[in-house]
């Protein structure tokens, strides 16, 4: 039996996931992080991206988050996300539309607050699409 740790994923709206996992992969401020049971304590920011959790027994679950914070303690990992959704709940058409709209706005703006907002929206839409793609790859494996 593989070692596990408790994972809690919480957004401003609701608790998204609570359970035992064998491994977690998230997008940190400095790149991807792989967290296994026994990982050293850590507190870091998270960028928009996906959360991949390998559940007890090896099943994979994918989530989307718009950014937030990650806290790793000896027995528990907590992800406090601005927004978090299970990848199966994402709307691919809406994500593609949001990405295209953000790209159009970026083409018009060269600097300023609107440019920064469009960049953030583009990153979030791209992260949603990556989470959907990751979910599809996972489904093909099983």
Curated annotation (Swiss-Prot):
Gene3D superfamilies: ATP synthase delta/epsilon subunit, C-terminal domain, F0F1 ATP synthase delta/epsilon subunit, N-terminal. The keyword Ion transport applies. One of its GO terms (cellular component) is plasma membrane. Keywords: ATP synthesis, Cell inner membrane, Cell membrane, CF(1), Hydrogen ion transport, Ion transport, Membrane, Transport. InterPro entries: ATP_F1_dsu/esu_C_sf, ATP_synth_F1_dsu/esu, ATP_synth_F1_dsu/esu_N, ATP_synth_F1_esu_C, ATPsynth_dsu/esu_N. Transmembrane segments: none annotated. It is found in: Cell inner membrane. GO terms for biological process: proton motive force-driven ATP synthesis. It is a peripheral membrane protein. It holds the Pfam family ATP-synt_DE_N. SUPFAM superfamilies: Epsilon subunit of F1F0-ATP synthase C-terminal domain (SSF46604), Epsilon subunit of F1F0-ATP synthase N-terminal domain (SSF51344). Its main location: membrane. The keyword ATP-binding does not apply. GO terms for molecular function: ATP binding; proton-transporting ATP synthase activity, rotational mechanism. Belongs to the ATPase epsilon chain family. Produces ATP from ADP in the presence of a proton gradient across the membrane. F-type ATPases have 2 components, CF(1) - the catalytic core - and CF(0) - the membrane proton channel. CF(1) has five subunits: alpha(3), beta(3), gamma(1), delta(1), epsilon(1). CF(0) has three main subunits: a, b and c. This is ATP synthase epsilon chain. It comes from Coxiella burnetii (strain RSA 493 / Nine Mile phase I).
């Amino acid at each position: 039996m593989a070692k596990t740790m408790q994972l809690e994923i919480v957004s401003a709206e609701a608790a998204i996931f609570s359970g035992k996992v064998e491994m977690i992969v998230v997008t940190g401020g400095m790149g991807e992080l792989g967290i296994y049971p026994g990982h050293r304590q850590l507190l870091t920011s998270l960028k928009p991206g996906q959360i991949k959790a390998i559940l007890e027994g090896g099943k994979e679950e994918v989530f989307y988050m718009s950014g937030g914070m990650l806290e790793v303690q000896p027995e528990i990992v907590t992800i406090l996300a601005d927004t978090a959704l299970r990848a199966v709940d994402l709307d691919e058409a809406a994500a593609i539309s949001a990405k295209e709209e953000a790209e159009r706005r970026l083409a018009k703006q060269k600097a300023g607050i609107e440019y920064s907002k469009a960049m953030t929206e583009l990153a979030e839409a791209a992260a949603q699409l990556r989470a959907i793609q990751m979910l599809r790859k996972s489904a093909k494996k099983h």
